[in-house]
């Protein structure tokens, strides 16, 4: 009983910030200029101009890779982000054959979806799911397939449509990723995770193949700056922006209890702060006039949440910054319907946001509240909350104890949390990092998306020269009595590395 009371108190505290936003009026309004084929409106006949050709104005072809790196209805927002991005590119004239979409595709037809067969990315937005190609779904959404697609390697792709980025030297590439992350890693619904060291090598290989002119990458994830900090060369003709710096969270938005709140039948967040910022900017601006730098500055301002960085994050930029003056249409296309707009965005300012890592708990709690009476489903929902929080506490305590065993009881916590100075990569040896993660998970259970935040701890263990044998001994001592069957890497789909 005491444990259950603690769980309730934890979740209630988690929801307090979002709940405080209820009842407040937002200023401004959201006026999407994109219309889905199924949407009707007074100006439907006026929105008829045909999309611009993908190769117009500069001689090359536009390519795009869109990745939603999660699964499960509690992560609704990531697939909503990616579907929305697809609609923007498609309206901009980027051909479907040149857009590769990775998404698990378990949201639109999920039993919990109050509007079956549709996905929305804004409380007042229309369906963004219609027409999105199913290139790589379910078990095909993997790091290996993503790398193969980016490199244009058709023989290395497993399953899916087989579509790859078959780009030429004069072409432009846009990559957008949305999911959970941690220091040096990005999530994938099928393990292992995407590790920064591997990603940078793939980008270098793509550049060496002379198969593109310029590339722009947008990444939505916690600690997403750590994927590129100290690693991203400036001579690859690749410009990157990330939702957060190397040491902070990114944030979900349009969540239950926020303003603007999703329709009452939705029990999960509809979008992510950085992602909706760039997309709502793109669809309300003339991308033949707006530059890459213009969008970066606008998104940075909005994502900081009016500089309330306890509920916002620092948008960062990496790589080659010499072509920021290029117009966005080179990467995202140009929607002729936006040709005469004034480049002024009126957006509703969220009164609160939800930490990416806690958004799943918000969903679980809203699901519990939605169920009536004392049904078996409601009890099962409560047990899921209890199990999830208990495993989080286990991860917290076991990592802390391992640090004390390895570095001493006095120095352990500080040694694990130490962040390197700006400009340095997270870890010197990425293979070591992966080995330490596997050792930990073999004894202590899966890290899960919550435990991704401890990648810096494993990196510091490597950077301090701790041996695999010592890490194994510490992990056994920390977790020897823990029944990890529920959270075994085998149960969770494999190791994170």
Swiss-Prot record:
The active site is at 180, 222 (nucleophile). The record marks 269 as: Required for post-translational maturation and enzyme activity. This is Vacuolar-processing enzyme beta-isozyme 1. It comes from Oryza sativa subsp. japonica (Rice). It is found in: Protein storage vacuole. Its EC number is 3.4.22.34. Its main location: other. GO terms for biological process: protein storage vacuole organization; proteolysis involved in protein catabolic process; vacuolar protein processing. GO terms for cellular component: protein storage vacuole. Belongs to the peptidase C13 family.
């Amino acid at each position: 009983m005491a444990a259950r009371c603690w769980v309730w108190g934890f979740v209630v505290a988690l929801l307090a910030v979002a709940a405080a936003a209820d009842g407040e009026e937002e200023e401004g309004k959201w006026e999407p200029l994109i219309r889905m084929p199924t949407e009707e409106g007074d100006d439907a006949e006026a929105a008829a101009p045909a999309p611009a050709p993908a190769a117009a104005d500069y001689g090359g072809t536009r390519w795009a890779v869109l990745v939603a790196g999660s699964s499960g209805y509690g992560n609704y927002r990531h697939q909503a982000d990616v579907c929305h991005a697809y609609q923007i590119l498609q309206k901009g004239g980027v051909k479907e054959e040149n857009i590769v979409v990775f998404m698990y595709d378990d949201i639109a037809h999920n039993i919990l979806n109050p509007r079956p067969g549709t996905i929305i990315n804004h409380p007042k937005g229309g369906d963004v799911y219609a027409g999105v190609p199913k290139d790589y779904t379910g078990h095909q959404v993997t790091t290996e397939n993503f790398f193969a697609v980016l490199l244009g390697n058709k023989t290395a792709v497993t399953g899916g449509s087989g579509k790859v980025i078959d780009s030429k030297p004069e072409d432009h590439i846009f990559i957008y990723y949305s999911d959970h992350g941690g220091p040096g890693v990005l999530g994938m619904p099928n393990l292992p995770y995407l590790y920064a060291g591997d990603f940078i090598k793939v980008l270098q290989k793509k550049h060496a193949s002379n198969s593109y002119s310029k590339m722009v990458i947008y990444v939505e994830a916690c600690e997403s700056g750590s994927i590129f900090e100290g690693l991203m060369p400036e001579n690859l003709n690749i410009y990157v922006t990330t939702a957060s710096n190397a040491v902070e969270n990114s944030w979900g938005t349009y969540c239950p209890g926020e303003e603007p709140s999703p329709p009452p039948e939705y029990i999960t967040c509809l979008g992510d702060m950085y992602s909706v910022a760039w997309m709502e900017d793109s669809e309300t601006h003339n991308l033949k006039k707006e530059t890459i730098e213009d969008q970066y500055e606008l998104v940075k301002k909005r994502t900081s949440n009016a500089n309330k960085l306890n509920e916002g994050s620092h948008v960062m930029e990496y790589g080659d910054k010499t072509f920021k003056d290029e117009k966005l249409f080179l990467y995202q296309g140009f929607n002729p319907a936006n040709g005469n707009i004034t480049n002024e965005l009126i957006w509703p300012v969220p009164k609160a946001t939800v930490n990416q890592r806690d958004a799943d708990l918000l969903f679980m709690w809203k699901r519990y509240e939605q169920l009536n009476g004392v049904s078996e489903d409601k009890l099962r929902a409560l047990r899921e909350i209890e199990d999830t929080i208990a495993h989080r506490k286990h991860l917290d305590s076991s990592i802390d104890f391992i640090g004390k065993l390895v570095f001493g009881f006095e120095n352990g916590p500080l040694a694990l949390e130490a962040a390197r100075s700006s400009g340095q990569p997270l870890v010197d040896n990425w293979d070591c990092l992966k080995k330490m993660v596997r050792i930990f998970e073999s004894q202590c259970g899966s890290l899960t998306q919550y435990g991704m935040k401890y990648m810096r701890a494993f990196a510091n263990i490597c950077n301090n020269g701790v041996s695999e044998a010592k890490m194994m001994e510490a992990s056994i001592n920390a977790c020897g009595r823990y029944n990890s069957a529920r959270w075994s890497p085998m149960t969770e789909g494999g190791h994170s590395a």
